[in-house]
């Protein structure tokens, strides 16, 4: 990993930075924090998820406008194409098919027998055995699609700052998890009705969700520490951020407790 893989926030200004970049960075960070705060439930179709999905729609439009104004690499084009094809695939599964077609698909014979036994006409049915679940899966793809598009529209320096924001979110979640452990199963800091009451869950309902966030933060923290070490070796004597180290310590403790 190169020493400059995770530079400090005082990177030099890069010319030709798209206008509105700072506002987009703040918007992306705020939406990311909102996703962590409101997401992570154990059930699908929660009102909080609907709020995040509705907010994602104008953000996707804004992200497309920002992304179209920047040079687009082949990798970015392929990533965007894949990100769009995934929810489209879910939506296609919800389209109704004629009986002559869907009854020939795998796993449909038993369903046809049950419909006939119940006296229900074998009419048009979707490709998906659970169209509602397929629709929820497509809608669940909106927030990550919005975040991805917004991030592609950011300058590299701003993308690094956004990653540093992920470290801050992970640190806050880890500290919240420790406070939940200290407060016990009835801690008011557990705001999900269905949750792991004997474990640290942070802003989520499931301890595995918190563990996934902390695991995601570990390589970011490692890059931050490697960059800081390289700058110290280079003779730069400026104070170092301690957030990355704190994330590593707290994350290690919580991973052991999980």
What are these regions (language model features)?
Residues 59-72:
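Canonical alpha-helical transmembrane segments
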Residues 2-39, 49, 53-62, 87, ...:
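Alpha-helical transmembrane segments of multi-pass inner-membrane proteins
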Residues 75, 101-105, 184-190:
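A cytosolic-side transmembrane-helix exit/cap motif
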Residues 73-74, 124-134:
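Extended N-terminal export/anchoring regions of large proteins
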Residues 74-84, 163-168:
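Cytoplasmic-side transmembrane-helix entry/capping segments in multi-pass membrane proteins
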Residues 42-43, 47-48, 74-77:
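N-terminal membrane-targeting/anchoring modules of bacterial envelope and secretion proteins
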Residues 100-129:
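Extracytosolic (periplasmic/ER-lumenal) interhelical loops and adjacent juxtamembrane/interface segments
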């Amino acid at each position: 990993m190169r020493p400059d893989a995770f530079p400090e926030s005082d990177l030099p200004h890069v010319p030709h930075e798209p206008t509105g970049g700072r506002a987009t960075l703040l918007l992306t960070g705020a939406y990311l924090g909102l996703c962590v705060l409101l997401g992570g439930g154990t059930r699908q179709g929660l009102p909080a998820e609907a709020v995040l999905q509705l907010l994602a729609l104008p953000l996707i439009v804004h992200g497309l406008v920002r992304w179209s104004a920047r040079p687009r690499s082949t990798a970015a084009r392929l990533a965007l194409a894949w990100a769009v094809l995934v929810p489209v695939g879910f939506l296609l599964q919800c389209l109704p098919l004629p009986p002559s077609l869907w009854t020939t698909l795998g796993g449909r014979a038993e369903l046809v027998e049950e419909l006939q036994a119940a006296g229900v006409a074998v009419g048009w049915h979707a490709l998906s055995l659970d169209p509602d679940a397929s629709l929820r899966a497509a809608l669940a793809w909106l927030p990550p699609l919005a975040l991805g598009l917004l991030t592609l529209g950011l300058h590299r320096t701003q993308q690094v700052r956004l990653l540093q924001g992920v470290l801050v979110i992970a640190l806050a979640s880890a500290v919240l998890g420790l406070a939940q452990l200290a407060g016990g199963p009835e801690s008011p800091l557990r705001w999900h009705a269905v949750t792991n009451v004997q474990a640290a869950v942070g802003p989520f309902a499931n301890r595995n969700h918190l563990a996934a966030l902390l695991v995601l933060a570990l390589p970011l923290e490692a890059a931050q520490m490697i960059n800081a070490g390289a700058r110290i070796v280079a003779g730069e004597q400026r104070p170092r951020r301690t957030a990355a180290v704190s994330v590593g310590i707290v994350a290690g403790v919580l991973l052991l407790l999980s």
